Amino acid sequence: MSLVQSHGTSGLFTEPPNSINQQESSGPSLPAQDATQASASSARAGATPAINSTKRKYRGAVVAQRATLSISAILDNGQCVQIKYHSNLASALTNLCNTNLYDLPACLNKPITVHNLPTLIEEAAASYSLIYYYQRGTVRKVEFRAEIPLLSFPLKFLVKHGKVFLIKDISPMQRCEFCGSFFKVTHTCTLRRRDFYFHHVASHSGDWWEKISFSPIGAPANTERLFIVYDVETYTWHGKFGKQLVPFMLVFQLLGDEHLVNAAKNLATTQNWDTWNSNEQTALYYCITPEKRAIGVKFKTFRDTLQQHFANNLWSHVLCQNPKLMEEAAALGLENPEDITANQLKKFKLQGTPRFIEVYVVGHNITGFDEILLAAQVVSTRAEIPPVFDISRNFMPRAGRLLFNDITYSLPNPSYVPSKDYRHWEQGQVLASDLKTQYIKFMVRDTFSLTHTSLKNAAKAYSLTVSKGCCPYQAVNEFYMLGSYQQDADGFPDLKYWKDQEEYCFNKDLWKKEKKGAYDIIQQTLDYCALDVQVTAQLVNKLIESYQIFIKNSVNLPETYFNVFQRPTISSNSHAIFKQILYRAEKPNAPHLNTIIMAPSNEMYEYVRLSIRGGRCYPTYIGVLQEPVFVYDICGMYASALTHPFPAGSPLNPYERAVAIKAYEHKMQEHKTISYFDEDLLPGIFTIDADPPAEEFLDVLPPFCSRKGGRLCWTNEPLRGEVTTSIDVITLHNRGWKVTLIPDTRTTVFPEWKCLAREYVQLNINAKEKADKSKNQTMRSIAKLLSNALYGSFATKLDNKKTVFSDQIESNIAKEIASGAYVVKSSSYIETDNLCAEIMPEFVVAYPPVNFDVHRLAPPSYSEEYPTENPHAEGPFMQNFNMTSYRYKPIMFIDAEDDDFCLHTLEKSTPLITNNRYASQIASFVLAWTRAFVSEWSQFLYENDAGIPLEKRILKSVYGDTDSLFTTMEGYRLMEEKGKRRLKKNGGNLVFDPNNPELTWLVECETKCEKCGADAYSSESVYLAPKLYALKDTTCPECQYVGKGKLRAKGHATSTLSYDVLKACYYADLQQGSDIFKTSRMSLRRTLTSVQTHVQPFTVTETTLTRKLRPWKDKTLHALDMNRLIPYSRKYPNPRNNETTWMELQWMT
């Protein structure tokens, strides 16, 4: 197999598998193609021309029915057989009896069916009888033996497709394990048949790989959009669930198409929303009330009424264009056309122009805060929507955020035509005729999910004309909790409520310049909230315009109507753009990506996920290091890795896979080092065993990591049963490890390499460079975000859970729950007191005992007013003379259906995950390429140390993070000498070149001098644990300037930490002192769905998180001395690894 240049996506392609790799045949055979040619050539050259015959009523060849037919199948015991049977049951039975000198028994002369066959066999009383039940390639055998035989010969019947046949003969067969064909002596299977059998027929592998669906990134040109941009302010309310944040203020602004904005403004005015700005064009609407949940109820009413208005508007539009619906409704016995159900409407052929209406509820960080606070009020879908609409909902809480909360009201699209020509899809276009429905979509979108930065930083990054203000949150909180707050001499909120002195003075000066009299904290908070909404509204417009320009110019899709808010996150947008570029390059002409890239599913999904190994992050030195340290960082590590070749195509069947594995084994036996771009090696995912070289040939940057001990460890121990990519196999082999490929049915080999994402990364790099030249900060931010987000979309982890409201459980889901396919994992209820309409107070009822004489116990007034009809009626047999009283607690009548506020978390009963969205193997290979980068990096530092024991080596690196390495002065010298071609300052490529295949990556020194820009170092540093370290300063060896250092403390409040604090913490622990170092920070606990009694669903509670600061205790490395750490190895094994590995020793067999 050889590597050739692609004419589509730039990359490396392999030639089709060579025809010589075919299964060996036991005898001569004639290929079907040759047989056809031979048959065609055998026709008589001088054949007489056909004579025109008279026209016949029936055409076609008359073929006599074959007397004997045959099938091949597998018996219960696994044996393959061929069953020959007679096509005519009656005549075959008669001939069989006559041959054995018997007359046909009367019982067998009756019509024989599948149901009466066992009874008739017992009546015939043959010495031995069999029934073979055939179903989908397998046969189930049932035996009968007569105690007093009437027939001396056996009867054998075949039941196939509901019919009964008499078996003539049963003979053994063989079956090809690669293509599933049955044969007796010889067999030759084709590559196409082997592939089809493996991917579509074989029960164990037929559902391992799924095609990835595709839809263009654009939207119909006539889509109507409305944006409701809002923000809320909260105060702390102390309740039974802790300090709960309660909104008391909500401000929103309306953007979008003019007619939709006007409709929403009219509705806001009707519902008495206050106006913050008198200008109608930029008016903001707000509501202020400290009443708990009142804000949510009012906002819910606005959103529900808006849904009803647009739904009625769309239905009126359809009704005007289809007046015949009035007649259809009358024919169905309905008074109003809107009473037609969604299923009934699908049967009618609608006319007219479709409408596509999208309403976005937008805010900054609302999916992690605001929407959770309001969710108990706004999540309901039960609005007054005509039943003619088909309603669907996508509600997905994940990791403390509302990832999706979308509702769609849809009607059939009269313009819909199934696509046959997909050329416009290659340009990212979506026509009205491509969509099956016309719709109204209500979607929640978060600008934080599209920018990954605070609103203050987003205003700078996207060059907005307004900027975020400041608010004394704690003062507002105390005002609502206590009725007052601390003020300075001028009546301004005290300094303690502000971030620092600078923020306090700046805001106080602004207040004084406004000259509005006494400080009104509520008005100031309203102005602050309104300013946030204005900033967010500008950001929304900026994102829409800038992404449209980016798609048009940088991606070169000028005809695409792209809306970045159509997808909720930057990751989902980057993945959609990547698939669009790939679709344009490969032109599959289908509604999916064909076999260009496929998604692992079911058993294969878990297998591929096992090959995804995380980043490297650990110190090899604990304590204070009093020597220079340089910090190197890989430039755009994931982006560079994405430009390299990746596996493409439909995975090979077991036969071709075995041939490809043999090529790897041969290369590892014959060559000490193997090229990553060897033409004979195909990409794959393998199960391996690997043994490291001798102890003195190891280093502190192992080529691979393992989870066998329960935690991810970068280890030099022997590897057993690890799932790796073919790149890791080469990396381990080149580092001196002995790698053995273990037979595994899940082992996957792909037919070719392709640079699938190279074009995507290249255009983002070009856009970023162009933005730098033109100083376009917005385009630079977009290009950088999209470039970094793609890898994460491939690594998305799926699960079998989904959260639904009770009213979303349709008949198909209910059936799956009843059958056990789904299990209700938990049920949660949103806060119900906000839905309360009426409360009946507590009351007591006393019930008198049952007695045969009611008049004797009843008061006189009762007897006179309600005389009994039969005063002599008998009472019950057993009398009860004790009074019984019942105390009824207050009854709450809810203004909602129970289905509206009951959430169910459903989980599939099977652990297997169906995946048709993400090519997870791409994420695995991205990380494998990064490990190859670091492996090459380690050779620059440690190649000369081979043969020297680890404890005698010079310290060259002290800390390694995912894409960075902290080196000593000796490590810096080696990088300047041996690794100079990988230094960005010396020039080099960040994008892989298919014409000159080699590892492509660059690093740069992150510790730079602030004055002259030269490489600088930290004169002293301290390392306590992974992601917990500090650099004292940055000292420039050129100009001697000493700049500020760097501190990293994940999970801690870094505002209270410094280099001296971390240093003191280390020495206190070393000397076993009594000092305790800890940090505290305010944390927000977001709860969406929960089964815990002390946690209320859809709430945000405020808690103080305190963490102890201390050196690394539960290390995942071996301590060589008081400071130095080395990875586990044979000499120093991982104490956590208790897993038993069974091995077969050759000398004992």
UniProtKB/Swiss-Prot annotation:
Pfam entry (one): DNA_pol_B_2
The catalytic activity, as recorded, is: DNA(n) + a 2'-deoxyribonucleoside 5'-triphosphate = DNA(n+1) + diphosphate
EC number(s) per entry: 2.7.7.7
Q: Please list where the region (Disordered) is annotated.
A: 1-49
Compositional bias (Polar residues) at which positions? 1-28
Q: Where is the composition biased (Low complexity)?
A: 31-49
Superkingdom, taxonomy of origin: Viruses
Subcellular location(s) of the protein: Host nucleus
Q: Which GO terms describe its biological process?
A: DNA-templated DNA replication; viral DNA genome replication
- What keywords appear on the UniProt entry? DNA replication, DNA-binding, DNA-directed DNA polymerase, Host nucleus, Nucleotidyltransferase, Transferase, Viral DNA replication
Task: Please verify whether the record's keywords include rRNA-binding.
Answer: no
Q: Into which family does the record put it?
A: Belongs to the DNA polymerase type-B family.
Q: What does this protein do?
A: Eukaryotic-type DNA polymerase involved in viral genomic replication. DNA synthesis is protein primed, and acts in a strand displacement replication. Assembles in complex with viral pTP, DBP, host NFIA and host POU2F1/OCT1 on viral origin of replication. The polymerase covalently transfers dCMP onto pTP, thereby initiating complementary strand synthesis.
| Subunit | Heterodimer with the terminal protein; this heterodimer binds to bp 9 to 18 of the genome. Forms a complex with viral pTP, DBP and hosts NFIA and POU2F1/OCT1 for initiation of replication.
Further information: This DNA polymerase requires a protein as a primer.
Protein name stated in the entry: DNA polymerase
Q: Which organism is it from?
A: Canine adenovirus serotype 1 (strain CLL)
